[in-house]
């Protein structure tokens, strides 16, 4: 049985701003772009979240919810440096590390000799060291697979630890609301509710075939998650192929015009994610992904196209024309050139 830890820093960017400027502590704080330039919230303090402010929200909306919100421009050089320090701590326990972002990672400690192989004690020690050495907090989840470890890390946020043992998996998953499953947004949850499915226990009552008929290949994934099954390995040093931002809408967007209205906010968030990349990648082909109301999806990309609003408008128009029906999800992204991988290939010759 595997032992997987999911580590997630608590409001990472905001935590570092408060660490480096004590006058910000205890304040409603958001890190992100200017509200005058369609800026979005990269992250925010828990004091800001109490007002309803959330990551990826338009900064203008955030300020309406919390007029006293303090807005700080991001310092990605600082965030990258601290992320490297956190990963150095991880490597003291295992080399099997899969980074998801600057502030989030999976660790496979199945074969780790530390603390007699106790994943719980390893997670406790990582949390202690990050707090003592870097003066920020992280939350951790321990479980037999990645799906459950990620859910566990969110269970007692902030500054928490939650453990799901192999013996607890079946009962824990049975009580989970289907909305907790990866890929299940509000629209899918409502669709499942109309089928009488609200928990994973409800999902288990049906057959895998019926879910596949209703949701396509996603139905098979749903069935596996409802049974606590996730065989995905921790992918060590997996090089990124792309950077993207996706949004699943509470209500399907009825036409192309409605889809186009969502582009500026999505592109602002995409630009923020691109800024967080290290220098071993170079942005290449832009792409747009659409998922229609019937769960069919399409992706359009174009070599040589720019990454400006007009280029994405054209790609979105092409993607919409392939389905020409209401849209439940829009994704925008960029394929990446792996400069590090290319350099390593050259060295081989």
Curated annotation (Swiss-Prot):
Residues at which Mg(2+) binds: 8, 103
Q: Which residues form the UmuC domain?
A: 4-185
What are the EC numbers? 2.7.7.7
Where does the record place the site Substrate discrimination? 13
Q: Does the keyword Cell inner membrane apply?
A: no
Keywords of this entry: Cytoplasm, DNA damage, DNA repair, DNA replication, DNA-binding, DNA-directed DNA polymerase, Magnesium, Metal-binding, Mutator protein, Nucleotidyltransferase, Transferase
Residues at the catalytic site: 104
Cellular component terms (Gene Ontology): cytoplasm
Protein name stated in the entry: DNA polymerase IV
- Organism of this sequence: Pseudomonas aeruginosa (strain ATCC 15692 / DSM 22644 / CIP 104116 / JCM 14847 / LMG 12228 / 1C / PRS 101 / PAO1)
Taxonomy of the source species: Bacteria, Pseudomonadati, Pseudomonadota, Gammaproteobacteria, Pseudomonadales
